[in-house]
Swiss-Prot record:
Disulfide bond sites: none
Task of the protein: Involved in peptide bond synthesis. Stimulates efficient translation and peptide-bond synthesis on native or reconstituted 70S ribosomes in vitro. Probably functions indirectly by altering the affinity of the ribosome for aminoacyl-tRNA, thus increasing their reactivity as acceptors for peptidyl transferase.
Matches recorded under CDD domains: S1_EF-P_repeat_1 (cd04470), S1_EF-P_repeat_2 (cd05794)
Pfam families the record matches: EFP (PF01132), EFP_N (PF08207), Elong-fact-P_C (PF09285)
Organism: Bifidobacterium animalis subsp. lactis (strain AD011)
Name of protein: Elongation factor P
NCBIfam families: efp, PRK00529.1
Keywords associated with the record: Cytoplasm, Elongation factor, Protein biosynthesis
Source domain of life: Bacteria
């Protein structure tokens, strides 16, 4: 669908030279001299390559429509993750590469937003935070302050995160899926 660069938003899918690119970030710039332009950081949907690209303001572009669906993670199968559409109960195989590094926070039963274009999955978005159980951590000693009162801990998915000294094995913690940071205790 033809629109202009003024319609660019984060998450927009652009068709440039027959390839799909997702806008990661954008900025409309109006310099004191010269015409306005749009500076973007875009990611190739298929290859994952990230590039910076600048467009003239008002330039016509092809935007693609994307279907966002909420799917529930079921299990891992080789190089794919299997998700279930909870309305139709269809199982959908999604390549691990689409989930990327966030896979270490993926727990069975987690609802994720999956973007599709022409029936093909483009991206998987995990919730902003997940609740995970600590499976292993060393006891925290109060006098050990070499690292601002945190210690490494392994969660049930196998990911390693930094937690406060008072957190022990078996406790549930809230973890940010963007950077893996500890957000708090969960009861």
């Amino acid at each position: 669908m033809a629109q202009t660069t003024n319609d660019i938003k984060n998450g927009s899918i652009l068709n440039l030279d027959g390839q799909l690119w997702q806008v990661i970030k954008f900025q409309h710039v109006k310099p004191g001299k010269g015409p306005a332009f749009v500076r973007t950081t875009i990611k190739n949907v298929l290859s994952g390559k990230i590039v910076d690209k600048t467009f003239n303001a008002g330039m016509k572009m092809d935007f693609e429509t994307v279907d966002n669906r909420t799917l529930q993670y079921s299990y891992e199968d080789g190089d794919n993750f299997v998700f279930m559409d909870m309305t139709t109960f269809d199982q959908i195989m999604i390549p691990k590469t689409l989930v990327g590094d966030k896979a270490k926070y993926l727990l069975e039963g987690t609802d994720c937003i999956v973007s599709f274009h022409d029936g093909q999955p483009l991206s998987v978005e995990l919730p902003a935070s997940v609740v995970l159980t600590i499976t292993h951590t060393e006891p925290g000693l109060q006098g050990n302050r070499s690292n601002a009162g945190t210690k490494p801990a392994t969660v049930e998915t196998g990911a390693e995160i930094q937690v406060p000294l008072f957190i022990g094995e078996g406790e549930k913690v809230k973890v940010n899926t963007d950077d893996g940071s500890y957000l708090g205790r969960e009861n």
